[in-house]
């Protein structure tokens, strides 16, 4: 799966490091001293969002519904 990261250089705000938000999953954010660290943190956040969404969907399945995993 490919995701889009919006990366902010925090030095423009007088701070250090970088912050990123995932365009497709705006609740997933990352930060780090380098762009690489920031993106790794964002990847982990996206993974956590997906894990949470997948686990919580089981609570809403109606009788006769099932989940299938697809490769996007």
Positions of the model-derived regions?
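Short stretches within intrinsically disordered, low-complexity N-terminal or propeptide regions
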Residues: 7, 21-22, 30, 64
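Short, charged, surface-exposed hinge/linker loops at domain edges
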Residues: 1-6, 36, 40-72
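A short, exposed loop/beta-hairpin motif centered on an aromatic-Gly-Thr core
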Residues: 26-37
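Short aromatic-glycine-(Arg/Gly/Cys) micro-motifs in beta-strand/loop hairpins
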Residues: 8-24
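Short amphipathic alpha-helical segments
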Residues: 3, 24-26
């Amino acid at each position: 799966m490919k995701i889009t990261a919006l990366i902010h250089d925090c030095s423009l705000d007088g701070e250090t490091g970088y912050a990123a938000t995932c365009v497709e999953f705006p609740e997933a954010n990352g930060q780090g001293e380098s762009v690489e660290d920031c993106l790794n943190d964002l990847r982990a956040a996206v993974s956590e969002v997906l894990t949470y969404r997948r686990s919580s969907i089981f609570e809403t399945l109606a009788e006769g519904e099932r989940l299938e995993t697809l490769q996007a």
